[in-house]
Amino acid sequence: MFAHSIRRHPNSCSCGLVTSIILLLFAVAGNAFAHGVTFKFQHAQAADSALSTQFLDPWAKKIHDDSRGRVSLLITPQDQHATGTELFQVVLERTADIVWLDLQQPAVSFPIFGVFGLPLAGTTAEGSSRALWTWTDINDLGFREFKELRVLAAARHDTPVFHMREKAVSSLSDLKGARIAIPTADAETFLTGLGASPVVISGIAMRDALAQSSVDGALLSWSGLAALELEELVKAHSSAPVGAPWAYAELSVLLMNPDAYRSLADDLKQVVRNYSGSDVSAWIGKSIDETASDARKRAADRGDTFTTLPESDLDKWREAASVAINKRVADLDARGLHGEELITRARALIEQYDTAN
């Protein structure tokens, strides 16, 4: 539909009716191209969220500007209760052309992509997101796991922290029986191994759970705490022992319907490619890191309590991580995916790209 304008040959008008019809069709196509294309871009982020203002909106503007106004992204935020599964269906059916997904259960629907949600090492969302993009690319996950959708970028968020309503977690013994909310079942095995009682609920439902004291706290990234507007509901924040792997990682992905991409002229496809990939994933990760830093500063300004679990808890933390990883390896093996090899390769990429680690 969006073809290049056609320069007509001087003798073309002397042809018959068929030629006239073809020329009319080219003229219509050329007119559509001249006016550009508008793609619908959906996500479940609040319009004033850090991710919206620091990445989603600027990214859409860059595509518009670099295409000289020929590609516009109409941002239509979904209800914040919309799940990743619902948004995935939206882009598959092309109700929207581009979507940003926060994945609740990547291990179930996207098992290879979900390896990066395991309790592996990491330091920054910026480096980890660059590693995740590379992982997605070299494993051809757009085709293999995202049903041939075009993966534009991927993000591994900052490390989760225990955010507690009242009392800080000073040692792992404090977690015994504690009801800890998590946004993904991927962390359930790990938390159980620490002695806690995990409560798997959507991120948006955590507000009510914390406000109504139905959970004692949440294991969530700082950026997630800010995005879900939970900061005023918790008073104490406890980090993993020094040298410990992350408890898990929240994963997100930016997807485009392939028919929408194919509808573009070649030069406009290049614009989309220019704003896809490793650097864009790192851009997302950097904005996540900055959001996390700002959230920690606000907590300090409120006078919240900060603790780091002691070195004596490191072995138990690592043991819980190993149990969670081994369980996933068994699941991957059952799918014929060579789990141990995948874990080894994922670790190598994180070490390569998360250079601060």
What is each of the regions a protein language model found here?
Residues 31-33:
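Signal peptide processing junction and immediate N-terminal pro/mature segment
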Residues 35-127, 144-146, 150-357:
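N-terminal secretory/targeting leader peptides
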Residues 5-7, 26-27, 285:
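Short linear motifs centered on Gly/Pro in flexible linkers and helix caps
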Residues 1-15:
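N-terminal secretory signal peptides that target proteins for export/translocation
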Residues 16-29:
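Bacterial N-terminal signal peptides
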Residues 125-141:
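A gly/proline- and charged-residue-enriched helix-loop-helix capping module
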